Design a protein with these regions (language model features):
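Bacterial N-terminal signal peptides
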Residues: 19-31
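Long, intrinsically disordered low-complexity tandem-repeat segments
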Residues: 43-58
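N-terminal secretory signal peptides that target proteins for export/translocation
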Residues: 1-16
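The substrate-binding groove and active-site-proximal loops of carbohydrate-active enzymes
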Residues: 165-173
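Short beta-strand segments at enzyme active-site cores
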Residues: 192-197
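Boundary at the C-terminal end of the N-terminal hydrophobic targeting segment
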Residues: 33-37
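Active-site-adjacent betaalpha module
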Residues: 59-137, 142-161, 165, 180-189, ...
Length: 400
């Protein structure tokens, strides 16, 4: 039926062929398009927009026509190469530069970013200028596991966060060496530094941390910290050992094997009943400040969205864990935030889960690469105040 319909209309077929030819011509003659100045600004719908450093600054309510011009980057350097211990650098042959997507009036923070397009045959980079005071830095799930708070991986075989004490230790070091300095550098400039945590806005943690509706006093914080430490210390972090015998049927012994001994069981069997009901603190690898805000996952996304919008936040620099799971799909994950805000994934300020590997380098590379199909990716060294000289890695990545 489909074939008959198509051949029944020669005119439609000719139209389709002309369209395919036109698209092919655009692709083949892309060099002409690429030859245009990739830094040329988008054309505003309304004339007379004020300019800043020669680039028109758009009014908040003015739509504009974006010139999607791409210019090839000659001899591009690897992306995300600043922390090779944690992130395997991204290498792609096709690299292009495009005009800014965001150019905020009075923008004071430069955020170079990139995305991948199969149709464009490569990575597209663009400079952006945003206002720091309209930006939130959010860290997803900085769990205080196996650190000074006392929330511990249950023994002998319990799992939480990156699922082994050794992997949790590596993640804590990444937090301390990469994420915490980033938070410290911009805390006084951005609208908020925020952390998302599992669970409800319980009576203990709302004494320890600022939340949407409450900023605790110093006395409340001190009392809350004592309560939290006691609650965590009182738990029995012991679960069952691994099974020493399994029952396998004659037909599907492989399925029987994995059903009784899965690769990841974070339930009461190995973690002990009540483990996941404990109030999880923010990792001690972060120097949390009184004005930092905690997002409680159980409240859902709408309260977070409304809080940010009420405080005129437009942009989010997203950090945290784990790139392939909570970072994308929990309350403060990019799948939610990108519906309402301009989100930049700070890729080297994130780690993916890394089963069967001693390093997260390759897992986070894969997770970020996949996310780049529909998200803008940046890195710590690509975020800097306007007027500050480019970092070596940014200059190298953008070299033409």
């Amino acid at each position: 039926m489909r074939r008959a319909t198509l051949h029944g209309s020669d005119q439609s077929l000719r139209s389709i062929r002309r369209m395919i030819f036109a698209l092919s011509f655009i692709t083949i003659t892309g060099g002409a398009i690429l030859a245009q100045d990739a830094t040329a600004p988008s054309v505003p719908v309304q004339d007379g927009a004020p300019a800043q450093d020669g680039v028109p600054v758009q009014d908040a309510n003015t739509t504009r026509e974006y010139r999607n011009t791409l210019r090839a980057i000659v001899d591009p350097q690897p992306l995300l190469a600043d922390h090779p211990e944690f992130f395997e650098p991204i290498i792609e042959r096709g690299r292009f530069e495009a005009p800014p997507i965001i150019d905020d009036p009075s923008g004071d923070l430069s955020v170079r970013a990139w995305r991948f397009s199969y149709n464009a045959r490569g990575i597209i980079e663009m400079p952006n200028r945003i206002r720091a005071d309209q930006t939130a830095i959010i860290m997803v799930h900085p769990w205080a596991i196996d650190d000074d708070w006392g929330w511990k991986s249950p023994q002998p075989n319990g799992v939480a966060d990156f699922c082994t004490p050794e992997k949790n230790k590596l993640a804590a070091r990444h937090t301390k060496e990469v994420i915490d300095p980033f938070l410290k550098r911009y805390r006084d400039d951005v609208a908020f530094v925020m952390y998302s945590l599992p669970g409800p806005a319980d009576p203990i943690r709302t004494k320890v941390y600022r939340s949407f509706g409450k900023t605790p006093t110093a006395q409340e914080r001190s009392a809350g910290e004592r309560e939290l430490r006691k609650r965590l210390a009182d738990f029995d972090y012991r679960g069952e050992p691994l099974p020493d015998r399994l029952t396998l049927g004659p037909q599907q012994p492989v399925a029987d094997y994995f059903r009784q001994f899965p690769g990841l069981d974070a339930g009461a069997r190995f973690n002990n009943e009540g483990f996941w009901s404990l109030p999880i603190p923010v990792s001690t690898s972060i120097d949390v400040k009184p004005n930092d805000v905690v997002i409680f996952d159980d409240e859902g996304y709408p309260p977070l969205r409304d809080f940010l919008k009420a405080n005129k936040v437009k942009h989010v620099l997203l950090t945290g864990y784990a790139t392939d799971m909570c970072y994308c799909r929990t309350t403060a994950g990019y799948e939610n935030l990108s519906k309402d805000f301009n989100v930049f994934l700070v890729a080297d300020a994130s780690l993916a889960t890394f089963p069967a590997n001693s390093t997260p380098r390759f897992a986070v590379n894969a997770a970020i690469s996949f996310a780049s199909l529909n998200q803008l990716i940046t890195q710590v060294s690509w975020v800097h105040p306007i007027g500050e000289s480019k970092t070596r890695s940014e200059a190298a990545a953008g070299a033409k």
